[in-house]
From Swiss-Prot:
Keywords, in A-Z order: Electron transport, Heme, Iron, Membrane, Metal-binding, Mitochondrion, Mitochondrion inner membrane, Respiratory chain, Transmembrane, Transmembrane helix, Transport, Ubiquinone
Co-factor requirement: heme b
One of the protein's GO biological processes: mitochondrial electron transport, ubiquinol to cytochrome c
Protein name per Swiss-Prot or TrEMBL: Cytochrome b
Annotated organism of origin: Geomys bursarius lutescens (Plains pocket gopher)
Bilayer-crossing regions: 33-53, 77-98, 113-133, 178-198, 226-246, 288-308, 320-340, 347-367
Protein role: Component of the ubiquinol-cytochrome c reductase complex (complex III or cytochrome b-c1 complex) that is part of the mitochondrial respiratory chain. The b-c1 complex mediates electron transfer from ubiquinol to cytochrome c. Contributes to the generation of a proton gradient across the mitochondrial membrane that is then used for ATP synthesis.
């Protein structure tokens, strides 16, 4: 009689994905973040579901309903802070996951990579509409400023903005539809994550050396289930430390003031995980140019497979490209800091230089470094 996990139609899918999956024997801890993103997604959907049971998407009661959740609902404060900080954890894991993909050349699995970019865009959209829901000052003004960027689109811009708003300003209609989007998008993300996995399992995982490992693959279970479980424990420890000891560290104090259309906060800024893109957008003095730069800051990732010039896949043995990669990481941290600063000297020029450097490294310097390293290999 066949083993049930190999014969049962449902168990067979799980078996091929998580048990008997042939996996490279040498993948490092940087490969843990895929499973950690899955955990973050489940955490966000569960905490979000419980929050949705008590939240009301009406401009008059939204802020009060969040206060009610924190004060009156059993462990409501915990669920709310888990959800808010879970988003930060999600993006930290997401950015490390993308960084790993760039460092080890995983972007050469084009279908998996492109679906990953789509997942990133959807996650950013989900986080943006979710940030509007508590209806605090930064929620309201963040929504106003970011949606207003669409008005820069020629001809249809203004109509598009009013269509998204459901009126002539961010109001009740906007809040209601943003709540609807925030509810449905994670379910779309879950479906796309499965497609992401499907394409990954067509090719098999990459590894730190960037070379084929078919001859030495090991089953996913027990080796990588154990390893992933260790990652889960470490992530949850950091998560609970953040939620229980530093619950408001990553939030904005302005969001504890109810939304007031008549009073603009001195510095309007999105959540920390969007600041790098916000800084790139702000560094261009033209509105349409800023919107294009904002989009390109993410979509530039889609060009990486076509800009790969090196004979080696991974950066493990490429010192020039390695240096550029870490300069890129430092540049992104710099952009994140600049995005949170007011628009005044010297922050303007720092943001502009950092933005140019970001595109320069990805579009020109890394492909050039790949060609130089190819030459060095011949010496």
């Amino acid at each position: 009689m066949a083993i049930m996990r190999k014969s049962h139609p449902l168990m067979k899918i799980v078996n091929h994905a998580f048990i008997d999956l042939p996996t490279p024997p040498n993948i490092s801890g940087w490969w843990n973040f895929g499973s950690l993103l899955g955990l973050c997604l489940v955490l966000q959907i569960l905490t979000g579901l419980f929050l949705a049971m008590h939240y009301t998407s009406d401009t008059l009661t939204a802020f009060s309903s969040v206060t009610h959740i924190c004060r009156d609902v059993n462990y409501g404060w915990l669920i709310r802070y888990m959800h808010a900080n879970g988003a930060s954890l999600f993006f930290i894991s997401l950015y490390i996951h993308i960084g790993r993909g760039i460092y080890y050349g995983s972007y050469l699995y084009t279908e998996t990579w492109n679906i990953g970019i789509l997942l990133l865009l959807l996650t950013m959209a989900t986080a943006f509409v979710g940030y509007v829901l508590p209806w605090g000052q930064m929620s309201f003004w963040g929504a106003t400023v970011i949606t207003n960027l669409l008005s820069a689109i020629p001809y249809i811009g203004q109509d598009l903005v009013e269509w998204i708003w459901g009126g002539f300003s961010v109001d009740k209609a906007t809040l209601t539809r943003f709540f609807a989007f925030h509810f449905i998008l994670p379910l779309i993300i879950t479906a796309l994550a499965m497609v992401h996995l499907l394409f990954l399992h067509e090719t098999g995982s990459n590894n730190p050396l960037g070379i084929p490992s078919d001859c030495g693959k090991v089953p996913f279970h027990p080796y990588y289930t154990t390893k992933d479980f260790l990652g889960v424990i470490m992530l949850l420890m950091q998560f609970l430390t953040l939620v229980l000891f530093f619950s408001d560290k990553l939030g904005d104090p302005d969001n504890y003031t109810p939304a007031n259309p008549l009073n603009t906060p001195p510095h309007i800024k999105p959540e920390w995980y969007f600041l790098f893109a916000y800084a790139i957008s702000r560094s261009i003095p033209n509105k349409l140019g800023g919107v294009v730069a904002l989009l390109m800051s993410i979509l530039v990732l889609a060009l990486l497979p076509y800009l790969h010039t090196s004979k080696q896949r991974s950066l493990s043995f490429r010192p020039l490209s390695q240096t550029l990669f870490w300069v890129l990481v430092a540049d992104l941290l710099l952009l994140t800091w600049i995005g949170g600063q007011p628009v005044e000297p010297p922050f303007i020029i720092i943001g502009q230089v950092a933005s140019i450097l970001y595109f320069l490294i990805l579009l020109l310097l890394m492909p050039m470094a790949g060609l130089i390293e190819n030459k060095l290999l011949k010496w």
